[in-house]
Amino acid sequence: MTNITSSFLCLLILLLFCLSFGYSLHGDKDEVLSVDVGSNAKVMKHLDGDDAMKKAQVRGRSGQEFSKETTKMMMKKTTKKETNVEEEDDLVAYTADYWKPRHHPPKNN
């Protein structure tokens, strides 16, 4: 009987200990999640504010005017530098790193 009560008390203490130092499953309101993701895909960035939506006045030959709403979108440049290496079927001299030699333009000195 004492063995059962002592094991029950140990489990109860362990449960209270886990609950007191536990973490919230849904997160706190003040927590900020930050994830760095590397990608070389092009991303469309939408401008906020008055710059994004503009009304342009369009006038035809007949003199009638009408307004056209335009949306301005900007392309974000890729962060990874792309290199163009021409594929050659010729034999390449053996090098330790197995890279083909690249042909660079001459320096302008």
Swiss-Prot record:
Inducing stimuli: Accumulates in both root epidermis and cortex after Pi- deprivation.
Tissues expressing the protein: Expressed in root tips.
Keyword annotations: Differentiation, Growth factor, Hydroxylation, Secreted, Signal, Sulfation
A Gene Ontology cellular-component term: extracellular space
Sulfotyrosine carried by residues: Y98
Prosegment location in residue numbers: 25-96
PTM annotation (Hydroxyproline): residues: P106
GO MF term list: growth factor activity
Stretch list, region Disordered: 54-88
Phenotype of null mutants: No visible phenotype, due to the redundancy with other RGF genes. Slower root growth after (Pi)-deprivation. Triple mutant rgf1-rgf2-rgf3 shows a decreased meristematic cell number resulting in a short root phenotype associated with an altered PIN2 traffic.
Domain of life: Eukaryota
GO BP: any one term: regulation of root development
Keyword field contains Nucleus: no
Signal peptide: 1-24
Other remarks in the entry: 'Golven' means irregular waves in Dutch.
Similarity-based family: Belongs to the RGF family.
UniProt-recorded name of the protein: Protein GOLVEN 5
